[in-house]
Every structure is written in C-alpha cells, then in structure tokens.
Amino acid sequence: MARRESSGGSGGLMSSAGLMRYFEAEESAIKIDPKTVIIAAVASGAFIWILNFTYGRFW
C-alpha cells in the first residue's frame, strides 16, 4: 500500500498566509452595492442609446 504523506508543517502556514492575504485585500477593497452597479449600467446604456438616436445613424 502507498504511504500517505503528512500535510502538517509548512502546508498549514501557507494556507493561513493565503487566508490572511485574502482578508487584508477584502478590507481595503472598494465596496459598491450591486444595485448601484446595475443602475449605473442601465443609465449609461440609456445615455448612449439617446446619443446614438440623436447624433448617430440608424442601421
């Protein structure tokens, strides 16, 4: 039978360091409500559509 390798030692430290790095990045990230993003996208699309209707050509 094959021997099972132990996952102790540096494996746990690397895992913990990765989690700490993730949480540090999460704290410094800009937090925007998803509804705000959707509203901004719809407003931008409507604005571009109006500009295209006013100044652009129709296909």
Curated annotation (Swiss-Prot):
InterPro entries linked to this entry: Preprot_translocase_SecG, SecG/Sec61-beta/Sbh
GO cellular component: plasma membrane
Residue numbers on the Cytoplasmic membrane side: 1-33
Name of one Pfam family that matches: Sec61_beta
Complex formation: Component of the protein translocase complex. Heterotrimer consisting of alpha (SecY), beta (SecG) and gamma (SecE) subunits. Can form oligomers of the heterotrimer.
NCBIfam families tied to this protein: PRK01253.1
Protein name in UniProt: Preprotein translocase subunit SecG
Higher taxonomy: Archaea, Methanobacteriati, Methanobacteriota, Stenosarchaea group, Methanomicrobia
